[in-house]
Every structure is written in structure tokens, then in C-alpha cells.
UniProtKB/Swiss-Prot annotation:
It comes from Gallus gallus. GO terms for cellular component: cortical actin cytoskeleton. WD repeats lie at residues 6-47, 50-89, 95-137, 140-178, 182-220, 226-265, 272-308, 313-353, 360-410, 434-476, 482-520, 525-563, 568-606. Belongs to the WD repeat AIP1 family. The gene is WDR1. InterPro entries: G-protein_beta_WD-40_rep, N2O_reductase_N, WD40/YVTN_repeat-like_dom_sf, WD40_repeat_CS, WD40_rpt. This is WD repeat-containing protein 1. Gene3D superfamilies: YVTN repeat-like/Quinoprotein amine dehydrogenase (2.130.10.10).
Amino acid sequence: MRMPYEIKKVFASLPQVERGVSKIIGGDPKGNNFLYTNGKCVVIRNIDNPAIADIYTEHAHQVVVAKYAPSGFYIASGDVSGKLRIWDTTQKEHLLKYEYQPFAGKIKDLAWTEDSKRIAVVGEGREKFGAVFLWDSGSSVGEITGHNKVINSVDIKQTRPYRLATGSDDNCAAFFEGPPFKFKFTLSDHTRFVNCVRFSPDGNRFATASADGQIFIYDGKTGEKVCALGGGKAHDGGIYAISWSPDSSQLLSASGDKTAKIWDVGANSVVSTFNMGSNVLDQQLGCLWQKDHLLSLSLSGYINYLDKNNPDKPLRVIKGHSKSIQCLTVHKNGGKSYIYSGSNDGHINYWDSDTGENDGFSGKGHTNQVSRMAVDEMDQLVTCSMDDTVRYTNLSKRDYSGQDAVKMDVQPKCLAVGPGGYTVVLCIGQIVLMKDKKKCFAIDDLGYEPEAVAVHPGGGSVAVGGTDGNVRLYSIQGTSLKSDDKTLEAKGPVTDLAYSHDGAFLAVCDANKVVTVFSVPDGYVEHNVFYGHHAKVVCIAWSPDNEHFASGGMDMMVYVWTVSDPETRIKIPDAHRLHHVSGLAWLDEHTLVTTSHDASVKEWSISYN
């Protein structure tokens, strides 16, 4: 028997980045994948085809760093609470092998010895800033001392005799010999925070990079200084990350001066300078050199594949969301199905549902959370945002234009579109009717707080769900909206509602974990009630077949229900593990799209036996 549901595609979130803080992109010893973190997730992506992704979500707290063991069989990931998890990479389930708490506080970096047997972990613990121990028992194999402030970076020489280096906010790097690892001496060449330390793959050298714009090269075995790259300053801004070439001859650096550079370390000269732009979001916070791939990470969260032959234009740029996705819709355009998603930073992204190729709209868009979106019959994406505007964006152009943003009197939180150029917008304490991108009618003094709205596909009827647990029906009459004086009762405060595509049913979900379906032709009598969610249901979407609909909740679960029989249902547990499901949409009768506060978009194949 086929599984009733199967994950088809995962369009992963971007790395979570912060201005002025370096971000680690972990490499894969086998060369296939790369790793980074966003929120509680570790994202594993295929380096040749980044649309192939896997998301690990077993940390209870925000994860900061994740790195493969040199064997390639395990990944170690560390979070803000000081938990280090070591987990299997060979199985889809990613079974936990070991969990340690080397110190209480944020883990900022970690490093393995080449035999995958020892791990060094550094960060901002309360009683110590680092630890080094055996991977299978947690027994200490030395001490990380010598710093009096948070340690940002650690690395271990991948050839014997082992050496270990650290970089700290005390403006110093430190050098250790071992095992057991013992502090040998401090390197105080830098004048600002040391952000990154890395040994070359052959172990002959290690490099340190700092907020002072300098990179120093040292002997990997003795720790003696060899040179400063560029003679003095390597970059005009702070340097956040460095990564060696596989043959140890060159070094990639990423800087707040909005450039990345390749250095010939032996000749002490710049081979290439990659100018990434002029916007503050073009600051470079991370980098990775793996096989022939050179990756750098911008403050925008975008991942750039650098082109040595054309330094001013990346080969490709991976885009997407780095903040939680709040809403979603889908639309067919020229035979292709596109997914549109909006996040809580105002960013709207569109995705080719087949390939995962994606981009944002050009121009200046929403400046705050996008709360709801829909596509109208004119092929415009209609969106409302906490910036108090409703926007109409032409989907064939995909660029924001100033004249198509309509200012609301109060903050909008939900909208629905209908035939005839109508949009109904719910603002706080107000319902606004718009026609052809203009406000034409408003109802204030509602006596209840409107939360969700749907327009009947035949036009004319509007259903508004309130926090008081009622659904009220209205009629569009020309340029006004009239109450029908008809109220339907949900089982709790209404969170979302939707008409089936044929207009026969209205499904209403509520904060009391229930979905109620009303039959429209029969005067909105209650047709069926659907129980199953363990927490507030927040979103609902009808399949094009009008016989099934999906609901998503704060319990991380998605259900696909059969209208005629509440017992015939498909349950997708942990659709987005540890994160609320925030949006649902159907590409076709058997393909469901889900989005979540984990900033990822997933496609599921649904089959009915």
C-alpha cells in the first residue's frame, strides 16, 4: 500500500544572520553537501543542486553551528543553551548518537579531530569558554584556557601532531598542543575581536581573521607568525570568515566591506576580489571553499556561488526566506505553477514549484510582516501587511510599484479577493471593501473583532469569522457591503475560513482545535465537524477536487480531510517539526504546499486509497 503522504520537495530557509556576527557554513568531507543553521533547524543542502535539502529539527533552542565529522557519518550541532548533539547523517531519521552540555551558554563554534574521535567546543559559557572531549564518552582531553572573554572560533589541525587554535573577543588568538590539549601561548597581533581561525587542510598553516580587517598567517606546527595578508589590512572592514582551498595554497575571506577575496597565501597577494554590492545587506558574513565551489554569505541571508572568472557576478545566488513565513498562495502562469510566500520581515518570494528556482520581487515592497496574500482575477498578487498597506503587484512583471500600495486607516490583518475586482480587507476593528485597487466602503463599529475572511467564488457573498466564535455573512452590493444578518457558530474563536472552489462548502477552523464545514446551498447548515488537532488550528485550504481540504495547526500537524466523512483523513505529523504550520495551498489535487515559522516551504504528494 502506498503511503498516503510523501514529502516531495523541501525548499529550505536561508541561514539566520545577524549584522556584525560571523556565520558558519559547514562543509561536507564527501563534498556533496553544505550545512548552516536557522532558528532551531540545521539545514543540509546539496551543493550542486541546492533545491535538494534536508532539515534537522531536534534542538529545543536556537542552533548556532553545525559541522560534519571528518568521517562524514555524523554531524555535531551546538545551540544557544550549550547543548551539543551528535547525530547520524546516513539515515533520514538522523538518530541521536550522543548529547553533551560542555558548558552553560551559547556554543559559537566546534571542531573535530581528523579521526572523528575528539571534539572541541567554544562559546560564551558562564564558568568557561571552551571544552575538548572524546566524542563517545564526553571525557575531557584537555583544557581550553588563555582567554578572558567569549571565544568565537576554534579549529584543530587535521594532521598529526595535533594543534588547536582559538579566537576571542579579547582580541587574541591562542595556540594549544595535545592531546591532551594544553594552552601554549597567546597570539596578540590583532587589535579587535578575532572572528575566525582556520588551519589549512595540509596542516602547514593556520590563519586568523579579525574585526580589525587583518588576516595573519601562522605556522601550523609551531604557531610562529609567517605574515599579514596584504602586508597590512586585508579588507577595509571587519573580516567575519575565512576558508582554505582544498590544496591549502589559497584562502577565501569574507568581509563587512561587502567584498570577498581569494588570496595566494605563499605569494601574499590577492588573486580575485568579489564586489558583492553597495547595500548594507551585501556585507559578507560567512564563506566556504569546497571542491570547485566558492560560497559566500550576505547579510541578506543570500548564498552566493562566486565565479573566479567573473568576480563581479556570482554564478548563482540562492534566495528564499530567513525569517518565519506567515502566508502563502499559489498561481499558475504560462503552464507553470508558482508558489508565493510572505515572511515577517516583509519579504515576498516566488518559487517555481518544479525546480525550486526562486527570487524576490524587485523594487521596494512591504516594510513589515506580510500577513495575508491572494491572487486576483487580474493576475495580481494582493497582499496586506503590518506596515498598514494593501499592495497589488502584477505577477507578469513581479516588481513593486509605488502607486499600487493602498494605505489603510488601521492595521490590516487578513484579506480575500473575489470576482469583479473586489478585495475585502479585515483591519483591526474594521472591514474595508475595495474595488479596482481603491477603497470604496468601510464598516466600523462592528461589535466584534474580525479575524478571517473569505469571498464566495461566485462573488457577492462574504464570510467574516470573529474572535467571538461566530461567522457573519455579508453581501457585496455595487460599492457597498451589507450585513445579511446571518450568523454561523464555530466551536471557538475563528482563526481561518475558506469556501470550496465550487462554492458548495464553507470550512471554518478555530482556536478550540475544531474544523466545522457548512453546506452553502442548504442555507449554511452544519455539514460535518472535524476533530483531530491537538492545538489551535490556524490555516485551511481546499483541494481543487472540492472533496478534500487541509488544515494546519500550532500542533505542527497537517490533516487532509474528506468532506463527506470526518473519519477518512490523512495525518501528517511533524510537517514542520517544532514549528507552527502557517500556510497551506494546493498545486493540484494531489500536491499540497505547506509553509511554517521555520521559514521553509514543503511540497507533499497526497494519495487517497
